[in-house]
Amino acid sequence: MLDGPLFSEGPDSPRELQDEESGSCLWVQKSKLLVIEVKTISCHYSRRAASRQSMDIQASYWARGPQNRTCRLRPGSPEPPPRRPWASRVLQEATNWRAGPPAEVRAREQEKRKAASQEREAKETERKRRKAGGARRSPLGQPRPELRNALRAAQPTGFPVFSRPERFGQVGRAPRPSALPQGDPGVAWAGPWGGRRPGPPSYEAHLLLRGAAGTAPRRRWDRPPPYVAPPSYEGPHRTLGTKRGPELSRAPTSSAPVPATTRTEGGRTKKRLDPRIYRDVLGAWGLRQGRGLLGGAPGCAAARARPESCKGAVEKSSGLAAAGLNSGGDGHSQAKTTGPVTEVALSGSTISSPPRPVPRSRQHLRGSRKGKEGSEEMWLPTCWLSSPKKPPVRHSQTLPRPWAPGGTGWKESLGQREGTEHETLEVWKVTRRAHTLPRSSRGPAGREGIFVIDATCVVIKSQYVPTPRTQQRQLAPSGESCIVSDSLRQPKPCLEEEGKGAAANPSVCQKRLLSSRVLNPPSEGREFEAEGRQQGDSSLEERSSSGLGFPVGEVNPRDAPTHPGSPEHSTLGPAAPGCAGSVKGPEAAGVPRRAGGGWARTPGPYAGALREAVSRIRRHTAPDSDSDEAEDLSAHSGSSDGSDTDAPGASWRNERTLPAVGNTRPREGGKTAELGDSIGEILDVISQTEEGLVREDTRKTPQGKRE
């Protein structure tokens, strides 16, 4: 409906002005191009309105608002992009810039729908005004339209040309965009054109613009909102900020201190300048890669330094640096942190880098080769002093230095390290700026440590890794601390078999292992035997079997030591020594291993917890650490060493253990193979951890047993 009136009117008074622009055709085409029915009006008016910005007065008129915006935006380029957003900056316009006018258009359309009558009235009023004042205003506005018309007339070829003229207009009319944006939504749009050309708007602004564009329209409310692509990366993100302390400090430092070092590699010197640009313009992006990629020099320096730094350690550190961090410098800092190899690298790499403490990575890389000799002498001591701290100096700028925890302490670290490396201080002074200060200081100060947040891979790994002691503490329920090592070792093999001598113990160990591998039922039988001998032990056996996933027989060895006080324990004491040897290697090792693995930690008392854990694991659920479930589980686990810790850890550990546990015995047969495998694994590791674990278990098991 708008189109008809617009056309008639557009041709009427606008024709005079728009004929110059060859506006009528253009409007239609553009409206079609925009695929916005009413866009014809806005397009038509855009030219007209551009010429008659007096007409822009009618912000009330939705079309006019668009016209005004369009006209203003168009001169600025916002308007054309909506029509030809695809041409100049597809990404930018699609993401950021289209937001302005497209949002307006959508809002306008909605407004039309919402207040079609009002809009019509406004249109009529505007049309009348245009007709009456169109000629008058057009003369006033004509000059502007004439500019546009001149461009468009010169480019009457069509909107394609027109769109490009508008680009020109954007360039030539850049001032106009500012003027046009005055009250138009496009102002943020057009104005940002000028301001944003350096870079895309902040993502927040982008979302506001683009989201706002899409929010009002939301025609399909039943569907999720359209995906808002992040602003195109034509320029640095505003959100990144220009605070590239390390990079700035390094690059400027590179320029200042590097002259000698940097001169050696003139290209790099230039690149250092580029890195400065990267820091300032690209910010964190420039920094992280400024060292490795954007800077170009740092990465190359690192690569060269690695091969060139003849020191194997230096190469290693360089490799580490390059591998660990994009920039060799960062890598070196990390390498330094890494350790002795790092230190070697420090002497080699850092020595050269000290001359340019901030650009240390580059200096190290470049200076290590060329400035190395002189700088090494000078900086070798300094490097060594600062190198432990320096590694952070190379801090890979994962985050803007200001965010680094040590940012505030940069002065102190700078004073200390830079005292060591006066040049670093100088560099820092040169590079330190309000925004850069923390980071530049960080360069030298980073030596303390590196604050790196590596979010490249968002992997949340939550694992409860109980100390071997904790796990085994639960395993040895009744073992008093008094019988910790001796009773544990002695009775373990003999637990099941009190009467059996040391000779029987090896077989017992074997039997236990076999039973654990073969089936838990055999272990159950043994467990029952143990129970006959020691009710407490049987419970211990069950616990250990359930906790460790070992058959009770297997667990019994520990259970017996666990109950050193029991008569069986006394009997075991003498026989145990023999068993201790045999059991200790294969079985004691097996049991503690499981404990280390986290299985040993769930004794019979935790059977409920184990079952819960198994079910949860199968359901891929876990009690919330904050929830009462964890507490309940801990209580169930009743581990003296920290139920809260045990509960979660026990849960997942128990899941593994349960298969072999007496509680899980129905499944044990199926799990026997797993148990056998795990047992072999356990035996391997347990021999090492057995003694310490057993002692701990014995001490803490009594509590667990009591619980």
UniProtKB/Swiss-Prot annotation:
Keywords of this entry: Cell membrane, Cell projection, Coiled coil, Cytoplasm, Endoplasmic reticulum, Membrane, Nucleus, Phosphoprotein, Postsynaptic cell membrane, Synapse
Membrane topology: Peripheral membrane protein
Subcellular location: Cell projection, Dendritic spine membrane; Cytoplasm; Endoplasmic reticulum membrane; Perikaryon
Region of interest called Disordered, as start-end residue ranges on this chain: 1-22, 67-86, 94-195, 213-273, 342-377, 389-421, 517-707
Residue ranges of the region described as Interaction with MAGI2: 186-236
Region (Nuclear localization): 113-131
Region annotated Interaction with ACTN1, chain positions: 340-434
Tissue expr: Specifically expressed in forebrain structures, particularly in neocortex, olfactory bulb, hippocampus, caudate-putamen, and limbic system (at protein level). Also detected in spleen, liver, kidney and placenta (at protein level).
Pfam families per the UniProt record, alphabetical: Dendrin
GO molecular function, one term: DNA-binding transcription factor activity, RNA polymerase II-specific
Task of the protein: Promotes apoptosis of kidney glomerular podocytes. Podocytes are highly specialized cells essential to the ultrafiltration of blood, resulting in the extraction of urine and the retention of protein.
Stated name of the protein: Dendrin
Species of provenance: Rattus norvegicus (Rat)
Taxonomic placement: Eukaryota, Metazoa, Chordata, Craniata, Vertebrata
